[in-house]
Amino acid sequence: MSKQTKTFEENLAELEGIVTKLERGDVALEEALAEFQKGMVLSKDLQKTLAEAEKTLVKVMQADGSEAEMD
């Protein structure tokens, strides 16, 4: 079975849905824990994608052709 890669926007929408669901507070504890774990994984993936995009932008923006890392 192949794992389909979701877009950044799809992952963000899924994370927002999880947050909304948990904020309502009408979820059973077991489901809340599972959703929280899923949200943490999504959050980590989103942060990784943003960091990679930032590195790419820094490389593109260097006028003199040199590459610099952002902190």
UniProtKB/Swiss-Prot annotation:
Keywords: Cytoplasm, Exonuclease, Hydrolase, Nuclease. The keyword 4Fe-4S does not apply. GO terms for molecular function: exodeoxyribonuclease VII activity. GO terms for biological process: DNA catabolic process. It catalyses: Exonucleolytic cleavage in either 5'- to 3'- or 3'- to 5'-direction to yield nucleoside 5'-phosphates. Its EC number is 3.1.11.6. Pfam families: Exonuc_VII_S. Bidirectionally degrades single-stranded DNA into large acid-insoluble oligonucleotides, which are then degraded further into small acid-soluble oligonucleotides. Belongs to the XseB family. Heterooligomer composed of large and small subunits. This is Exodeoxyribonuclease 7 small subunit.
